């Protein structure tokens, strides 16, 4: 489709083409073919320092705190400091859904939307609770 999406291989739209390992579930992230490979008896296994994400119709990477720190966003709004593929939970203020920190693990108030909280208790951030 002219993108890096696909189960194994895609076109030249991502830095000269890319390979996507089968264990990597993100349909819009790839590994460039220029990455170092290791010869195996049957296949070549790509090894990269980090995957490269490209924009999609619907973002598949996330930045729950909207801080572009530590979590992956589409490459059009992803800074160089974005390295993680798995997003961390946010810390949330007590009475509202505004994130106050990315010190995890923390939870958000049950009234917050859209995503549910993975934990029911929070660590404290300095002297104030996260939620």
Swiss-Prot record:
InterPro entries: KAP, KRTAP_type_2-like. Disulfide bonds: none annotated. GO terms for cellular component: cytosol; keratin filament. Pfam families: Keratin_B2. Wool. Coiled coil: none annotated. Keywords: Keratin. The keratin products of mammalian epidermal derivatives such as wool and hair consist of microfibrils embedded in a rigid matrix of other proteins. The matrix proteins include the high-sulfur and high-tyrosine keratins, having molecular weights of 6-20 kDa, whereas the microfibrils contain the larger, low-sulfur keratins (40-56 kDa). PANTHER family: KERATIN-ASSOCIATED PROTEIN 2-1. This is Keratin, high-sulfur matrix protein, IIIA3. It comes from Ovis aries (Sheep).
């Amino acid at each position: 489709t002219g993108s890096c999406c696909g189960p194994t291989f895609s076109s030249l739209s991502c830095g000269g083409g890319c390979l996507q390992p089968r264990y990597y579930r993100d349909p819009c992230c790839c590994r460039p073919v220029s990455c170092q490979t290791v010869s195996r008896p049957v296949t070549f296994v790509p090894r990269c320092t980090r995957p490269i994400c490209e924009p999609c119709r619907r973002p598949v990477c996330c930045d729950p705190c909207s801080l572009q720190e530590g979590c992956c966003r589409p490459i059009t709004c992803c800074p160089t400091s974005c390295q993680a593929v798995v997003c961390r939970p946010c810390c949330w203020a007590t009475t509202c859904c505004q994130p106050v920190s990315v010190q995890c693990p923390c939870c958000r108030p049950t009234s917050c939307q859209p995503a549910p909280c993975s934990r029911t208790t929070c660590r404290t951030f300095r002297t104030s609770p996260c939620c």
